[in-house]
């Protein structure tokens, strides 16, 4: 325990409920022979009276929440008058001790190799501990009730080699979102291994599968999860539209720059405003965007097609949504913009799967796949020391798997 000059620990109580420890309450009292100090000048002063008992959160002991209890004294300082005494474990009126605030702040930024240093052990010991923790969780996790999964690929490492991609399978039910499986490469064989790892009972019980338009995934899902409603992720479609608009902008910018620098200025600093949703563009970017839309440039027509397509997701009827999709593809094919025509051909080729999004509305967590992908990117950025797939796999399960944990009396974070 931490020692504080002028104070002693009087009593320690363990509060239990239903046979389990709930909290540790430590009563603190002032030392009998030492005066309290003014909280402003820190000089000793005679006592005046006592305030009601307060409670501060301290560093947990053995995984049990720990609190200090103390009734602060007021002292009569010659310079500052009657004032609350200086409390060495506290800062102002905060209900958390300074030790606990430092503890939380350090753990909030701590990485795995720093954990090894903090507990005076090796990186290998930390890694093996996490590996055991993940293996225990995978062996004891329950997969009953999984009805919706998302399948996606994630780029990992440097370069675009096949080994630098991961295939991930998520549970995306509204009630639960977690990582179920991760494998190396983005091939049919990889996805087959992932579905096999889930087990035949889980695969047969699936009602919805969400994926992008990667052909190997589409083929495996159709062959092995045919009973489930296959939905194409709307965020991947939006990404294709944004890429098409950016291709039109870059091609037109090159063409205008060849004519004159002044003409090319019309598209300068417009990349990100063009890729954002129109309703979210504000200020000077909005003014430049409005000036562009008033022109007859190809980029303005491409942006208009992209914004028009956003209305597609607002439909509730599959029939009306299908009619809008046909109308939009008709416009795109006659826009004389090859990137937009390419998107239109892609949407027509996958129209049944795109319309399944409306049939599954409310049944799966929309945007869950992209949200979990973002969390994976956070883990990869934070884990610069993970240079092998095995270490990366352990890190992803540990952070996103929502795995059960073995019982332990020591839970510090």
Question: For each predicted feature, which ranges?
Answer:
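Long C-terminal interaction/binding lobes of large macromolecular proteins
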Residues: 1-25, 30-32, 99, 120-139, ...
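Short metal-coordination and nucleic-acid-contact micro-motifs, chiefly zinc-binding Cys/His arrays
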Residues: 30-35, 70-73
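Acidic/histidine-rich catalytic cores and adjacent linkers
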Residues: 35, 40, 46, 160-163, ...
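Short, positively charged, Gly/Tyr-enriched micro-motifs
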Residues: 42-46, 51-149, 153-160, 203-204
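Short small-residue beta-strand/loop micro-motif enriched in glycine and branched aliphatics
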Residues: 84-87, 175-181, 355-356
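Short, polar/flexible loop-turn hinges at active-site or ligand-entry regions and domain interfaces
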Residues: 87-91, 204, 228, 252-257
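Short, surface-exposed amphipathic charged segments that create phosphate/polyanion-binding patches used
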Residues: 165-166, 242-254
């Amino acid at each position: 325990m931490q020692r504080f000059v002028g104070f002693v620990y009087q009593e320690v109580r363990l509060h239990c409920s239903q046979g389990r420890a709930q909290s540790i309450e430590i009563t603190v009292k002032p030392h009998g022979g030492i005066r309290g100090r003014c909280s402003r000048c820190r000089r000793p002063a005679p006592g005046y009276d006592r305030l009601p008992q307060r409670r501060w959160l301290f560093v947990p002991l053995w995984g049990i929440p720990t609190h200090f209890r103390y009734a602060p004294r007021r002292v009569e300082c010659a310079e500052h008058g009657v004032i609350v005494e200086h409390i060495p474990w506290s800062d102002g009126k905060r209900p958390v001790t300074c030790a606990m605030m430092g503890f939380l702040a350090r753990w909030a930024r701590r990485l795995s190799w720093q954990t090894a240093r903090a507990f005076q052990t090796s990186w290998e010991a930390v890694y093996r501990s996490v590996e055991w923790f993940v293996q225990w969780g995978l062996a004891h996790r329950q997969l009953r009730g999984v009805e919706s999964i998302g399948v996606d690929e994630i780029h990992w490492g440097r370069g675009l080699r096949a080994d630098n991609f991961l295939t991930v399978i998520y549970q995306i039910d509204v009630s639960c979102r977690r990582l179920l499986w991760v494998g190396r490469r983005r091939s049919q064989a990889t996805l087959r291994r992932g579905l096999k790892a889930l087990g035949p009972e889980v695969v047969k019980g699936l009602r919805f599968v969400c994926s992008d338009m990667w052909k190997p995934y589409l083929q495996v899902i159709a062959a092995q999860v045919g009973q489930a409603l296959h939905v194409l992720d709307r965020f991947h479609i939006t990404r294709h539209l944004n890429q098409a608009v950016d291709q039109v902008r870059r091609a037109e910018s090159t063409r205008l720059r060849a004519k004159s620098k002044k003409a090319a200025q019309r598209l300068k600093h417009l990349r990100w405003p063009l890729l954002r949703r129109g309703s979210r563009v504000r200020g000077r970017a909005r003014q430049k965007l409005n000036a562009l839309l008033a022109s007859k440039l190809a980029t303005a027509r491409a942006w208009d097609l992209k914004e028009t397509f956003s209305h597609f997701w607002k439909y509730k009827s599959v029939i009306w949504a299908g009619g809008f999709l046909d109308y939009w593809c008709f416009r795109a094919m006659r826009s004389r913009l090859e990137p937009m025509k390419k998107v239109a051909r892609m949407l027509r080729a996958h129209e049944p799967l795109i319309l399944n999004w409306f049939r599954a509305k409310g049944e799966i967590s929309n945007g869950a796949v992209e949200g979990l992908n973002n969390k994976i990117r956070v883990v990869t950025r934070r884990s610069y020391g993970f240079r092998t797939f095995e270490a990366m796999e352990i890190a992803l399960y540990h952070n996103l798997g929502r795995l059960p944990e073995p019982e332990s009396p020591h839970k510090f974070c």
